[in-house]
């Protein structure tokens, strides 16, 4: 980089500002362009596909540069933000026309992935959360804000896993790091999320911030919320009056699902595509507003665990189901509601334009209709919500009176304020309209006097108004009649005192009109700004109405039923349940329903059956039904009674975490560990083919030990599918375990999967038949069948040793599975060691390590 002594004053100014924003692209305003220099220019040219040029190109050390027009800059900024970069916008804060010397410039906003306000850079139905975290060495203070909507929440989290789960649920793109954050947490966040880290060293002393945090008690929450607000203040450099008071939330007050469980269940993101399609959110989303869509996703992320709250939502859904025509009218009204949350945010932020205010007015005009429809169906269940569903008639009247229906996007170029709103503005506009008439009359008069029929009066910004005469007609012009102003190739341009006086009147009226109109718009915006709290409350209420009508619409379309949930029961009975997403995907094809019954004494369903027969679908079906029920939606079944679960843990599918360098088996053990450590008797555990990622005996031993541990220690409702058919004898010794299987029949040498759950264990796995369906070569399948027959002829039973107070000691004579006709002395020693191992007193990891050592001896 050149020495400062060689730089021009302008480049000195640039370098001084850039030094304050080293981690951002600096968009430096020069006239009608934003220019980038040095490394910023080189990198931006590549990312944005701009032409890279240089400043002082003939010098020994030319400065790389590129630029974008200021009126088109937003698209380029959005591209950089989407790719995880920050952009510092540096504007001219003095008028170059009235400034002597260097124009003062300063950064007016630092745009980051977590602070996007431009609507084109935001997905309508997705929140854009900026998060912050710090630790005192024992716990973590955590806070998040959506700058576009003003939502601000904070919590104290127990451990790193809690931070990871919250950050993943929020899909945060940027996190402000406080003190003491472990490197392990940063690494895990980077692996799991496309995230950038920012820092904020100080907490601003600010009366506005104190007001936003004055209801918080925990010091960690106060500190981290202060850091988050300070970061917003430093980066945005403007009013944050739309930020709502910080609300403390506790993850334990909602149904908890860790990152793995949400991923496995495909609540909002498809495992295969990473998109919304094919997820529970995709199924349930019949919302008509953007803010309703965002609230639906928030409800999915945090299902309820309070029976009263769940029933309150169910009552409102039921009332909408019972009022078909009112629901249609409600949907029509909601369709005309724009994004009130983000409109309110842009008002406070100072980025709202005339069209935004028209959208705001249109939205507010729907409120009386929405309220009337809700009042008409209300039997008491809507009372709490109706308190906040009030029209804002004064704002509607203000905007209707002041803002032009066809207002342009720019607020500094006129045509924003309606005629009749301001007398002075009307006078200026009359002068402008009369001026045009005066010009037309003057043009006609000059044509008459000169006899030149194609004489015309024109205008440009350099010369103002002028009379233009073609060169072929100059001979007909009286000498000295006009003052020559400009010579063109085919014409001459002239002015007269009368024309200049008209120009003064017209341009003065135009200039004053635009300036007055801008000031009037700002005044209207300030009046709207005083109603931010009312608008945000109204937005939340309409969002809830929208989500509830979406539930009613889906429930009617797919004939869902209202589930019965009780917090004091262990009885689970879902009759003829269906997987909601699979049912939608199948469309008109027949879906085979399945019931799930677990009485208070049954904690574990051990599921066996053929591969591809529907075991995983059955397990996901239960989890999704639970989630739907606990967000207040109806469920796909003939009837449903269930307890209220506090947590869901899943291990479904072979989703190797290859990026993190973790194998299938390691991921299995990590996910199993989460359930075994944190599950309670009120939790739901779903383990699909646990143990398949390692050697057969290792996997079988761990699977059995985990089943026994859940039965004895955890006592949570558990669905455990397995291909280890030897485990089905556990029902003889574990009273809380019940065998079920997926039915299949053989007909003419072919296997037909019934996709129907039946009591008892499966008798075969039908693996060769699945291989046949997959198209493996016939000779290979025939050989596999021969080998299978030979193995089955030699097979005996596996030792099942259950260490439990209620089970008598297993006799030494228990038969054992032998794959070889002769067993070596070393192998007998290993078997003896296995017999003596007390699996129930070992963690899964201890068992795995021991098995690894034994495996080395064979």
Swiss-Prot record:
NCBIfam families, alphabetized: mutS1, PRK05399.1
Family of the protein in this entry: Belongs to the DNA mismatch repair MutS family.
Keyword field contains DNA-binding: yes
Function per UniProt: This protein is involved in the repair of mismatches in DNA. It is possible that it carries out the mismatch recognition step. This protein has a weak ATPase activity.
Gene Ontology biological process terms, A to Z: mismatch repair
Any Pfam family matching the protein: MutS_I
GO molecular function: ATP binding; ATP-dependent DNA damage sensor activity; damaged DNA binding; mismatched DNA binding
Official protein name in the record: DNA mismatch repair protein MutS
Binding site for ATP: 609-616
């Amino acid at each position: 980089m050149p020495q400062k002594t060689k730089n021009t004053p302008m480049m000195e100014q640039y370098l001084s500002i850039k030094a304050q924003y080293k981690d951002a692209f600096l968009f430096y305003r020069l006239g009608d362009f934003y220019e980038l220099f040095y490394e910023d220019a080189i990198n931006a040219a590549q990312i944005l596909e701009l032409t890279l040029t240089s400043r002082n190109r003939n010098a020994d050390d030319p400065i790389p540069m590129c630029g974008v027009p200021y009126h088109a800059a937003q698209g380029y900024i959005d591209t950089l933000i989407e790719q995880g970069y920050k952009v510092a916008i540096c504007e001219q804060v003095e008028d170059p026309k009235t400034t002597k010397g260097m124009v003062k410039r300063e950064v007016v906003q630092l745009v980051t992935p977590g602070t996007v306000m431009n609507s084109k850079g935001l997905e309508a139905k997705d929140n854009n959360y900026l998060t912050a975290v710090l630790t005192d060495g024992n716990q973590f203070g955590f806070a998040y804000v959506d700058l576009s909507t003003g939502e601000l929440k904070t919590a104290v989290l127990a451990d790193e896993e809690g931070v990871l789960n919250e950050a993943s649920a929020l899909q945060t793109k940027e996190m402000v790091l406080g003190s003491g954050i472990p490197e392990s947490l940063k690494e895990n966040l980077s692996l799991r999320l496309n995230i950038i880290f920012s820092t904020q060293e100080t907490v601003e002393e600010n009366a506005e911030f104190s007001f936003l945090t004055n209801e918080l008690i925990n010091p960690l929450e106060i500190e981290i919320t202060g850091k988050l607000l300070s970061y917003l203040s430093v980066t945005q450099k403007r009013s944050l009056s739309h930020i709502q008071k910080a609300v403390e939330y506790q993850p334990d007050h909602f149904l908890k699902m860790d990152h793995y469980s949400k991923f496995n269940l495909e609540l909002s993101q498809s495992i295969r595509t990473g998109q919304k399609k094919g997820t529970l959110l995709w199924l349930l989303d019949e919302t008509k507003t953007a803010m309703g869509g965002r609230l639906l996703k928030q409800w999915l992320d945090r299902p309820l665990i309070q029976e009263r709250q769940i029933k309150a939502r169910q009552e409102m859904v039921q009332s909408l189901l019972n009022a078909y025509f009112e629901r249609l009218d409600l949907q029509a009204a909601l369709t005309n509601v724009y994004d009130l949350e983000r409109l309110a945010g842009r008002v406070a932020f100072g980025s709202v334009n005339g069209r935004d205010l028209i959208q705001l007015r249109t939205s507010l005009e729907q409120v009386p209709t929405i309220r009337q429809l809700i009042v008409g169906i209300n039997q008491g269940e809507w009372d709490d919500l109706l308190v906040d569903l009030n029209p804002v008639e004064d704002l509607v009247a203000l905007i209707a009176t002041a803002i032009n229906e066809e207002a342009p996007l720019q607020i500094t170029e006129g045509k924003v304020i309606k005629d009749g709103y301001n007398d002075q503005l009307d006078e200026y506009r009359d002068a402008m309209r009369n001026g045009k008439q005066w010009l037309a009359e003057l043009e006609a008069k000059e044509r008459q006097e000169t006899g030149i029929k194609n004489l015309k009066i024109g205008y440009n910004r350099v010369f103002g108004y002028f009379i233009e005469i073609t060169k072929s007609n100059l001979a007909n012009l009286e000498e000295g009649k006009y003052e020559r102003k400009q010579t063109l190739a085919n014409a001459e341009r002239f002015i007269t005192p009368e024309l200049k006086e008209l120009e003064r009147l017209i341009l003065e009226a135009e200039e004053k009109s635009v300036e007055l109109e801008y000031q009037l718009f700002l005044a209207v915006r300030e009046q709207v700004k005083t109603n931010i709290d009312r608008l945000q409350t109204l937005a939340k209420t309409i969002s809830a109405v929208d989500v509830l009508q979406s539930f009613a619409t889906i429930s009617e379309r797919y004939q869902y039923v209202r589930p019965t949930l009780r917090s004091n029961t262990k009885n689970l009975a879902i009759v003829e349940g269906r997987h909601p997403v699979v049912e939608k995907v199948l469309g008109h094809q027949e879906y085979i329903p399945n019931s799930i019954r677990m009485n208070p004494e049954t904690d574990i369903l051990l599921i066996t059956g053929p591969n591809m027969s529907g075991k995983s679908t059955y397990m996901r079906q239960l989890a999704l039904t639970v989630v739907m029920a606990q967000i207040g939606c109806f469920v796909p079944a003939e009837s449903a009674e269930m307890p209220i679960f506090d947590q869901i843990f899943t291990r479904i599918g072979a989703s190797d975490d290859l990026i993190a360098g973790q194998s299938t088996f390691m991921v299995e053990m990590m996910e199993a560990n989460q359930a075994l450590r944190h599950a309670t008797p009120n939790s739901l555990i779903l383990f699909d083919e646990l143990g398949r990622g390692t050697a057969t005996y290792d996997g079988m031993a761990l699977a059995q030990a985990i089943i026994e541990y859940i039965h004895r220690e955890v006592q949570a409702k558990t669905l455990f599918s397995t291909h280890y058919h030897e485990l089905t004898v556990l029902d003889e010794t574990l009273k809380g375990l019940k065998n079920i299987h997926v039915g299949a029949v053989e007909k003419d040498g072919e296997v037909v999967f019934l996709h129907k759950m039946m009591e008892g264990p499966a008798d075969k796995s039908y693996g060769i038949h699945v291989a046949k369906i997959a198209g493996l070569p016939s000779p290979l399948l025939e050989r596999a069948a021969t080998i299978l027959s030979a193995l089955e002829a030699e097979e005996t039973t596996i030792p099942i040793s259950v260490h439990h107070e209620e089970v008598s000691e297993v006799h030494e004579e228990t038969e054992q599975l032998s794959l070889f006709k002769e067993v070596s002395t070393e192998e007998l020693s290993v078997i003896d060691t296995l017999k003596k191992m007390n699996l129930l007193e070992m963690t899964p990891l201890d068992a795995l390590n021991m098995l690894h050592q034994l495996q080395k001896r064979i």
